[in-house]
UniProtKB/Swiss-Prot annotation:
Residues where FAD binds: G9, G10, G11, L12, A13, G14
Catalytic reaction annotation: uridine(54) in tRNA + (6R)-5,10-methylene-5,6,7,8-tetrahydrofolate + NADH + H(+) = 5-methyluridine(54) in tRNA + (6S)-5,6,7,8-tetrahydrofolate + NAD(+); uridine(54) in tRNA + (6R)-5,10-methylene-5,6,7,8-tetrahydrofolate + NADPH + H(+) = 5-methyluridine(54) in tRNA + (6S)-5,6,7,8-tetrahydrofolate + NADP(+)
Annotated EC: 2.1.1.74
GO cellular component, one term: cytosol
Record's protein name: Methylenetetrahydrofolate--tRNA-(uracil-5-)-methyltransferase TrmFO
Gene Ontology biological process terms from the UniProt entry: tRNA methylation; tRNA wobble uridine modification
Organism, as annotated: Solibacter usitatus (strain Ellin6076)
Enzyme class, spelled out: transferase
Family: Belongs to the MnmG family. TrmFO subfamily.
Stored Pfam families: GIDA
Compartment annotation: Cytoplasm
Cofactor section: FAD
UniProt function note: Catalyzes the folate-dependent formation of 5-methyl-uridine at position 54 (M-5-U54) in all tRNAs.
One MF term in the entry's GO annotations: tRNA (uracil(54)-C5)-methyltransferase activity, 5,10-methylenetetrahydrofolate-dependent
Protein encoded by which gene: trmFO
Amino acid sequence: MSKPIHIIGGGLAGTEAAWQLARRGLACTLHEMRPVRPTPAHQTDRLAELVCSNSLKSESESTAPWLLKEELRRLDSLLLQCAQKARVPGGHALTVDRDIFAREVTAAITAEPLITLLRDEVSSLSADAIWIVASGPLTSGPLAEEIARLTGSGRLYFYDSISPIVDAESVDTSIAWWASRYGKSTDGTDDYLNCPLDRGQYEHFVDELLKADSVSAHIPEDNTCYFEACLPIEEIARRGRDTLRFGPMKPMGLDDPRTGRRPWAVVQLRQENLRAESFNLVGFQNHMKFPEQKRVLRLIPGLQNAEFLRYGQIHRNTYINAPALLTAALNLRARPEIFFAGQISGVEGYVESIATGLMAGIHAAALATGDTPRPLPRQTALGSLCHYVSGADPKDYQPANITFDLLPQLEEAERQRLRRDKKARHALVCQRALEALEEYRHAIV
Protein backbone atom coordinates (compact mmCIF):
# COMPACT_ATOMS: atom_id res chain seq x y z
CA MET A 1 0.00 0.00 0.00
CA SER A 2 1.41 3.40 -0.99
CA LYS A 3 1.93 6.23 1.45
CA PRO A 4 -0.85 8.83 1.79
CA ILE A 5 -0.30 11.94 -0.35
CA HIS A 6 -0.85 15.42 1.06
CA ILE A 7 -0.70 18.73 -0.81
CA ILE A 8 -0.31 21.97 1.11
CA GLY A 9 -1.91 24.96 -0.60
CA GLY A 10 -4.98 25.34 -2.79
CA GLY A 11 -3.45 27.83 -5.18
CA LEU A 12 -2.41 27.33 -8.78
CA ALA A 13 0.33 24.79 -8.11
CA GLY A 14 -1.49 22.82 -5.43
CA THR A 15 -4.74 22.38 -7.34
CA GLU A 16 -2.90 21.34 -10.51
CA ALA A 17 -0.80 18.84 -8.55
CA ALA A 18 -3.91 17.33 -6.96
CA TRP A 19 -5.60 17.02 -10.35
CA GLN A 20 -2.61 15.25 -11.89
CA LEU A 21 -2.54 12.74 -9.03
CA ALA A 22 -6.27 12.07 -9.40
CA ARG A 23 -5.88 11.60 -13.16
CA ARG A 24 -3.44 8.80 -12.37
CA GLY A 25 -5.90 7.11 -10.04
CA LEU A 26 -4.28 8.24 -6.79
CA ALA A 27 -6.19 9.63 -3.84
CA CYS A 28 -4.77 12.73 -2.18
CA THR A 29 -5.64 15.31 0.46
CA LEU A 30 -5.47 18.99 -0.48
CA HIS A 31 -5.02 21.34 2.48
CA GLU A 32 -6.03 25.01 2.13
CA MET A 33 -5.81 27.22 5.21
CA ARG A 34 -8.27 29.85 3.96
CA PRO A 35 -10.74 30.84 5.40
CA VAL A 36 -9.53 29.39 8.73
CA ARG A 37 -6.43 31.54 8.39
CA PRO A 38 -6.75 34.38 5.86
CA THR A 39 -3.85 36.03 4.03
CA PRO A 40 -3.19 39.74 3.43
CA ALA A 41 -3.66 39.40 -0.34
CA HIS A 42 -6.58 37.00 -0.90
CA GLN A 43 -10.17 38.25 -1.03
CA THR A 44 -12.08 34.93 -1.05
CA ASP A 45 -11.78 31.34 0.12
CA ARG A 46 -11.90 29.94 -3.43
CA LEU A 47 -9.13 27.76 -4.76
CA ALA A 48 -6.69 29.16 -7.33
CA GLU A 49 -7.59 32.78 -6.59
CA LEU A 50 -5.49 35.17 -8.68
CA VAL A 51 -4.32 38.01 -6.45
CA CYS A 52 -2.20 40.09 -8.81
CA SER A 53 -2.75 40.36 -12.57
CA ASN A 54 -5.47 38.43 -14.41
CA SER A 55 -3.15 37.67 -17.34
CA LEU A 56 -1.53 34.31 -18.04
CA LYS A 57 0.80 35.98 -20.53
CA SER A 58 1.27 35.72 -24.28
CA GLU A 59 -0.64 33.42 -26.60
CA SER A 60 1.48 34.47 -29.57
CA GLU A 61 2.81 31.30 -31.17
CA SER A 62 6.51 30.50 -30.76
CA THR A 63 6.99 32.74 -27.74
CA ALA A 64 8.31 31.23 -24.51
CA PRO A 65 5.06 31.81 -22.53
CA TRP A 66 3.06 30.24 -25.38
CA LEU A 67 5.37 27.22 -25.43
CA LEU A 68 4.98 26.62 -21.70
CA LYS A 69 1.19 26.80 -21.97
CA GLU A 70 1.16 24.55 -25.04
CA GLU A 71 3.16 21.92 -23.16
CA LEU A 72 0.74 22.15 -20.23
CA ARG A 73 -2.23 21.74 -22.54
CA ARG A 74 -0.68 18.62 -24.04
CA LEU A 75 -0.26 17.20 -20.55
CA ASP A 76 -3.95 17.86 -19.77
CA SER A 77 -3.55 20.74 -17.33
CA LEU A 78 -6.79 21.38 -15.46
CA LEU A 79 -5.99 25.02 -14.88
CA LEU A 80 -5.34 25.76 -18.55
CA GLN A 81 -8.76 24.24 -19.31
CA CYS A 82 -10.35 26.46 -16.66
CA ALA A 83 -8.50 29.51 -18.00
CA GLN A 84 -9.96 28.91 -21.44
CA LYS A 85 -13.47 28.77 -19.97
CA ALA A 86 -12.87 32.03 -18.07
CA ARG A 87 -11.16 33.86 -20.92
CA VAL A 88 -11.82 37.57 -21.52
CA PRO A 89 -10.42 39.83 -24.26
CA GLY A 90 -6.78 40.65 -23.55
CA GLY A 91 -4.91 41.38 -26.76
CA HIS A 92 -2.42 38.63 -27.53
CA ALA A 93 -2.44 37.43 -23.90
CA LEU A 94 -4.49 34.72 -22.20
CA THR A 95 -6.50 36.92 -19.86
CA VAL A 96 -9.20 35.56 -17.56
CA ASP A 97 -12.14 36.64 -15.46
CA ARG A 98 -10.56 35.86 -12.11
CA ASP A 99 -13.88 35.06 -10.39
CA ILE A 100 -15.00 32.62 -13.09
CA PHE A 101 -11.53 31.06 -13.16
CA ALA A 102 -11.46 30.44 -9.40
CA ARG A 103 -15.02 29.09 -9.46
CA GLU A 104 -14.18 26.67 -12.29
CA VAL A 105 -11.10 25.34 -10.50
CA THR A 106 -12.90 25.05 -7.17
CA ALA A 107 -15.83 23.21 -8.77
CA ALA A 108 -13.54 20.75 -10.57
CA ILE A 109 -11.49 19.97 -7.46
CA THR A 110 -14.47 19.56 -5.12
CA ALA A 111 -16.25 17.32 -7.64
CA GLU A 112 -13.29 14.93 -7.95
CA PRO A 113 -13.85 11.94 -5.59
CA LEU A 114 -10.13 11.13 -5.36
CA ILE A 115 -9.35 14.60 -3.93
CA THR A 116 -10.24 15.36 -0.30
CA LEU A 117 -10.26 19.10 0.36
CA LEU A 118 -9.52 20.09 3.96
CA ARG A 119 -9.74 23.67 5.18
CA ASP A 120 -6.96 23.61 7.74
CA GLU A 121 -3.47 24.91 8.41
CA VAL A 122 -0.56 22.48 8.17
CA SER A 123 2.42 23.22 10.38
CA SER A 124 4.38 19.95 10.32
CA LEU A 125 5.26 17.32 7.70
CA SER A 126 5.18 13.74 8.97
CA ALA A 127 7.65 11.18 7.63
CA ASP A 128 4.97 8.58 6.82
CA ALA A 129 3.46 10.46 3.87
CA ILE A 130 4.32 11.98 0.51
CA TRP A 131 4.05 15.77 0.61
CA ILE A 132 3.78 18.44 -2.07
CA VAL A 133 4.43 21.85 -0.53
CA ALA A 134 2.67 24.42 -2.69
CA SER A 135 1.89 26.92 0.04
CA GLY A 136 2.73 29.91 -2.11
CA PRO A 137 4.39 33.23 -1.43
CA LEU A 138 2.27 33.87 1.66
CA THR A 139 3.28 30.70 3.50
CA SER A 140 2.19 30.87 7.15
CA GLY A 141 4.78 31.41 9.86
CA PRO A 142 4.51 27.95 11.48
CA LEU A 143 4.84 26.15 8.15
CA ALA A 144 7.75 28.38 7.11
CA GLU A 145 9.52 27.44 10.34
CA GLU A 146 8.92 23.75 9.61
CA ILE A 147 10.31 24.15 6.09
CA ALA A 148 13.36 25.96 7.48
CA ARG A 149 13.88 23.10 9.94
CA LEU A 150 13.55 20.43 7.23
CA THR A 151 15.86 22.18 4.81
CA GLY A 152 18.35 23.49 7.35
CA SER A 153 18.14 26.98 5.94
CA GLY A 154 16.54 30.31 6.59
CA ARG A 155 13.87 31.85 4.42
CA LEU A 156 14.43 33.83 1.28
CA TYR A 157 12.03 36.50 0.17
CA PHE A 158 11.32 39.35 -2.13
CA TYR A 159 8.57 41.96 -2.08
CA ASP A 160 5.77 41.83 -4.63
CA SER A 161 2.81 44.13 -5.16
CA ILE A 162 -0.58 44.05 -6.87
CA SER A 163 -2.30 46.49 -9.21
CA PRO A 164 -5.37 48.60 -8.44
CA ILE A 165 -8.78 47.90 -10.01
CA VAL A 166 -11.25 50.64 -11.00
CA ASP A 167 -14.98 50.60 -11.71
CA ALA A 168 -15.51 50.66 -15.48
CA GLU A 169 -18.31 53.24 -15.27
CA SER A 170 -15.98 55.72 -13.58
CA VAL A 171 -13.53 55.79 -16.51
CA ASP A 172 -13.96 58.81 -18.80
CA THR A 173 -14.22 57.28 -22.27
CA SER A 174 -14.28 60.70 -23.90
CA ILE A 175 -10.55 60.68 -23.09
CA ALA A 176 -9.65 56.98 -22.88
CA TRP A 177 -9.97 54.95 -26.08
CA TRP A 178 -10.08 51.27 -26.99
CA ALA A 179 -7.05 49.81 -28.77
CA SER A 180 -4.49 47.03 -28.64
CA ARG A 181 -0.84 47.94 -29.08
CA TYR A 182 0.03 47.88 -32.80
CA GLY A 183 -3.46 46.45 -33.36
CA LYS A 184 -2.32 43.06 -32.03
CA SER A 185 -5.13 40.92 -30.63
CA THR A 186 -5.98 37.24 -30.63
CA ASP A 187 -9.42 37.93 -32.12
CA GLY A 188 -8.97 41.24 -33.93
CA THR A 189 -10.73 43.31 -31.27
CA ASP A 190 -9.42 46.29 -29.31
CA ASP A 191 -8.87 44.89 -25.85
CA TYR A 192 -7.44 47.73 -23.75
CA LEU A 193 -8.69 51.12 -22.64
CA ASN A 194 -5.84 53.60 -23.06
CA CYS A 195 -5.40 56.78 -21.04
CA PRO A 196 -3.05 59.28 -22.76
CA LEU A 197 -0.71 61.74 -21.05
CA ASP A 198 1.08 64.64 -22.69
CA ARG A 199 4.54 65.61 -21.51
CA GLY A 200 3.36 68.08 -18.90
CA GLN A 201 0.81 65.66 -17.48
CA TYR A 202 3.42 62.92 -17.34
CA GLU A 203 5.99 65.11 -15.55
CA HIS A 204 3.37 66.21 -13.00
CA PHE A 205 2.32 62.60 -12.44
CA VAL A 206 5.92 61.50 -11.81
CA ASP A 207 6.48 64.40 -9.40
CA GLU A 208 3.43 63.49 -7.34
CA LEU A 209 4.21 59.78 -7.48
CA LEU A 210 7.69 60.35 -6.07
CA LYS A 211 6.26 62.52 -3.27
CA ALA A 212 3.49 60.08 -2.31
CA ASP A 213 3.46 58.35 1.07
CA SER A 214 4.03 54.61 0.80
CA VAL A 215 3.18 51.78 3.16
CA SER A 216 6.23 50.69 5.11
CA ALA A 217 7.70 47.35 4.12
CA HIS A 218 8.68 46.91 7.81
CA ILE A 219 12.37 46.57 6.91
CA PRO A 220 15.00 49.17 6.00
CA GLU A 221 14.37 50.52 2.49
CA ASP A 222 17.85 49.69 1.24
CA ASN A 223 17.27 46.03 2.16
CA THR A 224 14.00 45.70 0.26
CA CYS A 225 14.25 43.12 -2.52
CA TYR A 226 11.77 43.29 -5.40
CA PHE A 227 11.13 40.89 -8.24
CA GLU A 228 12.29 42.87 -11.28
CA ALA A 229 9.34 41.86 -13.51
CA CYS A 230 6.80 43.15 -10.98
CA LEU A 231 8.28 46.36 -9.61
CA PRO A 232 6.07 48.94 -7.88
CA ILE A 233 5.66 52.03 -10.05
CA GLU A 234 7.28 54.15 -7.33
CA GLU A 235 10.42 52.02 -7.57
CA ILE A 236 10.42 52.30 -11.37
CA ALA A 237 10.08 56.09 -11.14
CA ARG A 238 12.98 56.31 -8.69
CA ARG A 239 15.23 54.78 -11.36
CA GLY A 240 14.76 57.71 -13.72
CA ARG A 241 12.10 60.17 -14.82
CA ASP A 242 11.55 58.51 -18.19
CA THR A 243 11.72 54.93 -16.94
CA LEU A 244 7.94 54.62 -16.59
CA ARG A 245 7.25 55.70 -20.16
CA PHE A 246 9.70 53.10 -21.41
CA GLY A 247 8.02 50.54 -19.15
CA PRO A 248 4.35 50.20 -18.13
CA MET A 249 3.47 53.63 -19.57
CA LYS A 250 5.14 53.20 -22.96
CA PRO A 251 3.06 54.77 -25.76
CA MET A 252 4.52 52.78 -28.67
CA GLY A 253 1.91 51.41 -31.07
CA LEU A 254 -0.90 53.53 -29.61
CA ASP A 255 -2.07 56.65 -31.45
CA ASP A 256 -4.61 58.89 -29.72
CA PRO A 257 -7.64 59.10 -32.07
CA ARG A 258 -8.37 62.62 -30.83
CA THR A 259 -5.03 63.93 -32.10
CA GLY A 260 -3.87 61.25 -34.54
CA ARG A 261 -0.51 61.30 -32.75
CA ARG A 262 1.29 59.09 -30.27
CA PRO A 263 0.98 60.45 -26.69
CA TRP A 264 3.99 61.10 -24.50
CA ALA A 265 2.87 58.24 -22.24
CA VAL A 266 -0.10 55.88 -21.93
CA VAL A 267 -1.70 53.97 -19.07
CA GLN A 268 -3.47 50.81 -20.24
CA LEU A 269 -6.56 49.38 -18.53
CA ARG A 270 -7.41 45.70 -18.96
CA GLN A 271 -10.88 44.33 -18.24
CA GLU A 272 -11.25 42.15 -15.16
CA ASN A 273 -14.32 40.13 -16.08
CA LEU A 274 -16.46 39.07 -19.04
CA ARG A 275 -18.93 41.90 -18.47
CA ALA A 276 -16.12 44.49 -18.49
CA GLU A 277 -17.47 45.99 -15.27
CA SER A 278 -14.00 46.68 -13.90
CA PHE A 279 -10.47 47.27 -15.15
CA ASN A 280 -7.03 46.81 -13.68
CA LEU A 281 -4.25 49.30 -14.35
CA VAL A 282 -1.73 47.21 -16.26
CA GLY A 283 1.71 47.22 -14.65
CA PHE A 284 0.59 49.70 -11.94
CA GLN A 285 1.34 47.56 -8.92
CA ASN A 286 2.27 49.87 -6.07
CA HIS A 287 2.32 50.25 -2.32
CA MET A 288 1.23 53.84 -1.85
CA LYS A 289 -1.15 54.45 1.03
CA PHE A 290 -4.74 54.17 -0.13
CA PRO A 291 -5.62 57.92 0.01
CA GLU A 292 -2.42 58.65 -1.89
CA GLN A 293 -3.30 56.11 -4.57
CA LYS A 294 -6.64 57.81 -5.13
CA ARG A 295 -4.98 61.24 -5.29
CA VAL A 296 -2.06 60.31 -7.54
CA LEU A 297 -3.80 57.89 -9.90
CA ARG A 298 -6.67 60.32 -10.46
CA LEU A 299 -4.09 62.62 -12.08
CA ILE A 300 -4.16 60.25 -15.07
CA PRO A 301 -6.43 61.67 -17.80
CA GLY A 302 -9.54 59.53 -18.04
CA LEU A 303 -9.23 58.46 -14.40
CA GLN A 304 -9.94 61.85 -12.83
CA ASN A 305 -13.17 60.47 -11.31
CA ALA A 306 -12.06 56.85 -10.94
CA GLU A 307 -13.73 54.72 -8.27
CA PHE A 308 -11.29 52.17 -6.89
CA LEU A 309 -12.62 48.68 -6.25
CA ARG A 310 -9.22 47.48 -5.05
CA TYR A 311 -6.10 49.43 -4.20
CA GLY A 312 -2.58 48.29 -4.92
CA GLN A 313 -0.85 46.47 -2.09
CA ILE A 314 2.56 45.10 -1.22
CA HIS A 315 3.17 41.63 0.17
CA ARG A 316 6.15 39.47 0.97
CA ASN A 317 6.87 36.43 -1.17
CA THR A 318 8.63 33.45 0.39
CA TYR A 319 10.68 30.88 -1.49
CA ILE A 320 13.32 28.26 -0.72
CA ASN A 321 16.85 28.12 -2.08
CA ALA A 322 15.76 25.38 -4.48
CA PRO A 323 19.10 24.70 -6.28
CA ALA A 324 20.70 23.79 -2.96
CA LEU A 325 17.82 21.51 -2.00
CA LEU A 326 15.79 20.07 -4.90
CA THR A 327 16.30 17.55 -7.67
CA ALA A 328 15.01 18.18 -11.19
CA ALA A 329 11.91 16.21 -10.12
CA LEU A 330 11.24 19.01 -7.58
CA ASN A 331 11.72 16.83 -4.49
CA LEU A 332 14.21 17.30 -1.67
CA ARG A 333 17.49 15.48 -2.16
CA ALA A 334 17.59 14.70 1.55
CA ARG A 335 13.88 13.83 1.85
CA PRO A 336 12.68 12.53 -1.56
CA GLU A 337 9.10 12.15 -0.33
CA ILE A 338 8.76 15.95 -0.02
CA PHE A 339 8.15 17.95 -3.21
CA PHE A 340 7.94 21.70 -3.71
CA ALA A 341 5.89 23.51 -6.35
CA GLY A 342 4.74 27.01 -7.21
CA GLN A 343 6.24 30.26 -6.05
CA ILE A 344 7.73 28.78 -2.90
CA SER A 345 10.03 26.75 -5.18
CA GLY A 346 11.34 29.97 -6.69
CA VAL A 347 9.41 30.34 -9.91
CA GLU A 348 7.58 33.56 -10.64
CA GLY A 349 4.38 33.77 -12.64
CA TYR A 350 0.99 32.13 -12.77
CA VAL A 351 1.78 29.70 -15.57
CA GLU A 352 5.14 28.81 -14.05
CA SER A 353 3.36 27.95 -10.80
CA ILE A 354 0.84 25.79 -12.66
CA ALA A 355 3.75 24.12 -14.48
CA THR A 356 5.67 23.16 -11.36
CA GLY A 357 2.44 21.95 -9.74
CA LEU A 358 1.75 19.72 -12.72
CA MET A 359 5.26 18.29 -12.67
CA ALA A 360 5.28 17.76 -8.90
CA GLY A 361 1.98 15.90 -9.23
CA ILE A 362 3.34 13.66 -11.99
CA HIS A 363 6.56 12.94 -10.09
CA ALA A 364 4.76 12.34 -6.78
CA ALA A 365 2.48 9.86 -8.56
CA ALA A 366 5.53 7.99 -9.85
CA LEU A 367 7.07 7.84 -6.38
CA ALA A 368 3.78 6.70 -4.83
CA THR A 369 3.50 3.79 -7.27
CA GLY A 370 7.07 2.60 -6.80
CA ASP A 371 8.56 4.20 -9.90
CA THR A 372 11.47 6.62 -10.13
CA PRO A 373 10.37 10.16 -11.02
CA ARG A 374 11.53 10.99 -14.53
CA PRO A 375 12.24 14.70 -15.17
CA LEU A 376 11.18 16.15 -18.51
CA PRO A 377 13.77 16.60 -21.27
CA ARG A 378 15.79 19.81 -21.13
CA GLN A 379 14.56 20.68 -24.63
CA THR A 380 11.09 21.38 -23.20
CA ALA A 381 10.03 24.55 -21.43
CA LEU A 382 8.83 22.44 -18.50
CA GLY A 383 12.12 20.57 -18.31
CA SER A 384 14.15 23.76 -18.56
CA LEU A 385 12.11 25.44 -15.83
CA CYS A 386 12.67 22.49 -13.49
CA HIS A 387 16.34 22.42 -14.49
CA TYR A 388 16.66 26.08 -13.51
CA VAL A 389 14.93 25.49 -10.18
CA SER A 390 17.25 22.61 -9.32
CA GLY A 391 20.42 23.66 -11.11
CA ALA A 392 20.85 27.43 -10.83
CA ASP A 393 23.62 28.97 -8.74
CA PRO A 394 22.45 28.57 -5.12
CA LYS A 395 24.62 31.49 -4.00
CA ASP A 396 22.38 34.05 -5.69
CA TYR A 397 19.14 32.27 -6.52
CA GLN A 398 16.42 34.54 -7.89
CA PRO A 399 12.85 33.68 -8.95
CA ALA A 400 12.47 33.12 -12.69
CA ASN A 401 9.83 33.44 -15.39
CA ILE A 402 9.99 31.22 -18.45
CA THR A 403 12.19 32.74 -21.17
CA PHE A 404 14.12 31.29 -24.08
CA ASP A 405 17.29 31.93 -22.06
CA LEU A 406 16.33 28.97 -19.85
CA LEU A 407 16.08 26.58 -22.80
CA PRO A 408 19.11 24.97 -24.50
CA GLN A 409 20.64 26.99 -27.33
CA LEU A 410 20.48 25.78 -30.90
CA GLU A 411 23.58 24.25 -32.41
CA GLU A 412 26.09 26.75 -33.80
CA ALA A 413 25.26 25.80 -37.39
CA GLU A 414 21.56 26.46 -36.83
CA ARG A 415 22.26 29.73 -35.04
CA GLN A 416 24.38 30.91 -37.94
CA ARG A 417 21.82 29.81 -40.51
CA LEU A 418 19.05 31.72 -38.71
CA ARG A 419 21.15 34.50 -37.22
CA ARG A 420 19.06 37.24 -38.86
CA ASP A 421 15.70 35.67 -38.03
CA LYS A 422 14.95 35.52 -34.31
CA LYS A 423 11.37 34.38 -34.93
CA ALA A 424 12.62 31.42 -36.94
CA ARG A 425 15.12 30.52 -34.20
CA HIS A 426 12.39 30.62 -31.58
CA ALA A 427 10.04 28.61 -33.79
CA LEU A 428 12.70 25.90 -34.17
CA VAL A 429 13.27 25.80 -30.39
CA CYS A 430 9.51 25.41 -29.89
CA GLN A 431 9.27 22.69 -32.53
CA ARG A 432 12.03 20.69 -30.86
CA ALA A 433 10.49 21.22 -27.43
CA LEU A 434 7.12 19.87 -28.51
CA GLU A 435 8.73 16.89 -30.26
CA ALA A 436 10.65 16.06 -27.06
CA LEU A 437 7.46 16.45 -25.04
CA GLU A 438 5.62 13.97 -27.26
CA GLU A 439 8.39 11.41 -26.77
CA TYR A 440 8.16 11.94 -23.01
CA ARG A 441 4.37 11.58 -23.02
CA HIS A 442 4.53 8.26 -24.83
CA ALA A 443 7.23 7.03 -22.44
CA ILE A 444 5.27 7.78 -19.24
CA VAL A 445 1.81 6.65 -20.41
